[in-house]
């Protein structure tokens, strides 16, 4: 009976209210912004469908969604993505210096609390002879992300579109190294400035005691059968249906340039390195000029960027416990599960307090800063430090 699970009842009620509020907000924004969408993205016709659930939830249940119109579909994101346009301006400036430097950033219409992006569909290469060009462009993209302090660009954040790898989420750009009194700033700086921080490159998988062993990088992450252990439904379509521990496939994403994913990457390392080197050297020379420095300042000053204190998987593992029936009976039990977050002794305890507050709403915690201030604030607008 539902009375046995008062926490579940509360969660359903709150989730329904948040969903209703978010849905009304989306429709209101669409009504106000549609003329701009018609002009900038060429939208025509009526809205036929909305697909929710693309990505994690933040900001009290808000998530990325796809809007389907008569002749097109676009991505709606409940956040300010002016950073896309700023980075695109810089990328286009560099391309004018050398036309072989191509970086595609989705066209974006950004508002203070929401944005629209063009939908980038997966377009695998028909001929493998184009792979050298693809991996040259991947090297260019890696250098771009690295030089602008990008991180957490895993396989879900990159779409292969012909000979172009296209990143579809730039909110983790312009990251700053975090300070930890116990670890030491020198070690953290060394780790931060490694190119592997971007997650675009293979990291030999994630090997943990729970059996997870998959490659998450945007370069190589693809389908793997029986990749890890987890809860699976068995005895489907019977009265004995239940969850049990079993093997789960890792589905991969749309990040590989060929559909079958069978690529001997070693053949293209030379192209990859050349792309990285070409962009790096061009950027190095441009950065000696006052014009380019002014361009960077004009486009990067005052941008809202995300701050990462933990990887998303760490939060997701805690949330998975909160979904267990045992944690739907007493709210105190949920608080005990959230206590695990305090095991990481951040020097600023306000970080963990905010993480707990956001995860009580079953959101992935999120924090922000602006490029012109030395402060961090959370999704509720609370200043953390």
Segment roles from a protein language model:
Residues 1-27, 164-385:
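C-terminal catalytic region of ATP-dependent kinase domains
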């Amino acid at each position: 009976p539902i009375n046995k699970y008062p926490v579940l009842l509360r969660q359903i009620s709150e989730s329904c209210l948040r969903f209703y509020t978010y849905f009304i907000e989306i429709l209101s924004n669409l009504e106000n912004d549609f003329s701009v969408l018609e002009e900038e993205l060429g939208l025509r016709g009526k809205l036929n469908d909305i697909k929710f659930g693309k990505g994690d939830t933040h900001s009290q249940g808000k998530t990325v969604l796809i809007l389907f119109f008569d002749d097109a579909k676009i991505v709606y994101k409940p956040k300010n993505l002016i950073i896309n346009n700023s980075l695109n301006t810089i990328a286009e400036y560099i391309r004018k210096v050398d036309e072989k430097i191509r970086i595609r950033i989705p066209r974006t219409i950004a508002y203070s609390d929401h944005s629209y992006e063009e939908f980038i569909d997966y377009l695998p290469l028909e001929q493998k002879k184009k792979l050298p060009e693809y991996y040259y462009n991947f090297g260019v993209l890696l250098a771009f992300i690295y030089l602008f302090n990008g991180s957490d660009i895993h396989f879900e954040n990159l779409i292969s579109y012909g000979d172009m790898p296209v990143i579809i989420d730039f909110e983790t750009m312009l990251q700053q190294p975090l300070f930890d009194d116990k670890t030491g700033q020198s070690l953290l700086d060394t780790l931060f400035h490694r190119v592997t921080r971007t997650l675009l490159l293979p990291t030999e998988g994630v090997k943990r005691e729970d059996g997870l062993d998959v490659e998450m990088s945007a370069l190589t992450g693809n389908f793997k059968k029986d990749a890890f252990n987890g809860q699976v439904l068995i005895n489907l379509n019977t009265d004995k249906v239940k969850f049990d521990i079993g093997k789960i496939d890792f589905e991969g994403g749309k990040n590989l340039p060929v559909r079958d994913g069978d690529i001997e990457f070693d053949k293209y390392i030379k192209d990859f390195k050349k792309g990285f080197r070409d962009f790096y050297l061009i950027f190095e020379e441009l950065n000696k000029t006052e014009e380019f420095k002014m361009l960077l300042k004009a486009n990067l000053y005052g941008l809202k960027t995300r701050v990462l204190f933990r990887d998303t998987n760490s939060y997701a593992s805690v949330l998975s416990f909160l979904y267990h029936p045992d944690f739907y009976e007493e709210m105190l039990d949920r608080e005990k599960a959230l206590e695990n977050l305090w095991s990481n002794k951040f020097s600023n305890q306000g970080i963990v307090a905010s993480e707990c507050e956001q995860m009580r709403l079953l959101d992935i915690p999120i924090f922000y800063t602006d490029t012109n201030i030395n402060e961090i604030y959370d999704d509720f607008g609370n200043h953390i430090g």
